[in-house]
Amino acid sequence: MNTLDFDKQPEETRVVVAMSGGVDSSVVAGLLKQQGYDVLGITLQLYDHGAAVHRAGSCCAGQDIDDARRVCETLGIPHYVLDYEKRFRETVINPFAESYVAGETPIPCVSCNQTVKFADLLATAKELGADALATGHYIRSRPNPSPEHPGRRALYRPADADRDQSYFLFATTQEQIDYLRFPLGGLPKAETRRLAEEMGLVVAKKADSQDICFVPQGKYSDIITKLKPNAALAGEIVHLDGRVLGTHEGILHFTIGQRRGIGIATGEPLYVVFLDARSRRVIVGPKEALETHRVYLRDVNWLGDETLAQAATGDGFACYAKVRSTRAPAPAVLHIDATGTYVDLTVGEAGIAPGQACALYSAPGDNARVFGGGFIERSEREPSAEASLKALLASPVAA
């Protein structure tokens, strides 16, 4: 077996590397080239090239495409740029805006991985005769240890917990996992940068991207209102007890758990508890109204060895769950019953927003297996807050 778990020599193994123009994917290309693989670099142009030319660190546009090209020249490998602007707009940007209109807080990186990167680019890699598509994500994949699944691979958290990207990859399908490779899963970020300098790559000291790649300076409201003007329609700010406290200029400016910038002064600390998109109401309440031990999921992607129904019916499936990208996995139980698919959290959370993800794991540590996860459809609050919210949502809205 070679280092990518193929039963042939590296020079007989073609690998397409998804190159964003950042240090991680560049080092992946360099490592595979050093190991003797037949490497091709592909960069996807995902949004307005002209608008992004002078924006560094934006990923997959402008300067980043040029950086990827220069890295490939240094490494002596072919580099191709594919125009996926239309596809990216249809599958990532438009759903991002629609999600905000629906009162959710979306994660566009998951949608991008689900569609453009791990579906479209993966198909292109296969058309080019590649044995695998490699990326710079910090996650590990290995052959599935179960004898009942020969030839299959499984996902595991990376060695560098601070760079763990498994939360954003919960929706990766089994077919995609079998084809993908993640060479940086066992490395700390500091080692990745050291390797980039050792290879003489122009991106060795390039800063990591921080914002959503297609949102300049984090001003997502500008993009949303351009695509969905009704997202900026005014509405009421209402307390859980029914009091109208003020007005707002669009639910897109709010997210569950928000305290600052609500635009009202009441003398009591209030948080955004719910976004009633249908009636354009921002519902606020005390911090305890955000607390939950149960989240309901939609679009569940299950990566366990038995079926989801087999695992989660009855007493449920004991696992660890992560409802925020920055949190460590915490004890939980996955259930399926007549009410839907849901996760009971042993340790309660607060401010969980619909549209975010819940990733599932075998254990809390850095070698935990990833069991998939789902998008959060709703959370069930503590009984008193849940009753107040249901009563408020059922009440008529003033014209």
Curated annotation (Swiss-Prot):
Residues at the site labelled Interaction with tRNA: H137, Q356
Gene3D superfamilies on file: Adenine nucleotide alpha hydrolases-like domains (2.30.30.280), HUPs (3.40.50.620), Translation factors (2.40.30.10)
Compartment(s): Cytoplasm
One GO CC annotation: cytoplasm
Pfam families xref list: tRNA_Me_trans, tRNA_Me_trans_C, tRNA_Me_trans_M
UniProt-listed GO biological process terms: tRNA wobble position uridine thiolation
EC top class, as a word: transferase
Interaction with tRNA: region residues: 163-165
Keyword Cytoplasm: yes
Keyword Ribosomal protein: no
EC number: 2.8.1.13
Disulfide bridge map: C112-C213
Residues that hold ATP according to the record: A18, M19, S20, G21, G22, V23, D24, S25, L44, G136
Active site: C112, C213
Function of the molecule: Catalyzes the 2-thiolation of uridine at the wobble position (U34) of tRNA, leading to the formation of s(2)U34.
NCBIfam families membership: PRK00143.1, trmU
Annotated PANTHER family: MITOCHONDRIAL TRNA-SPECIFIC 2-THIOURIDYLASE 1 (PTHR11933:SF5), TRNA 5-METHYLAMINOMETHYL-2-THIOURIDYLATE -METHYLTRANSFERASE (PTHR11933)
Family: Belongs to the MnmA/TRMU family.
Name of the protein this chain belongs to: tRNA-specific 2-thiouridylase MnmA
Organism of origin: Rhizobium leguminosarum bv. trifolii (strain WSM2304)
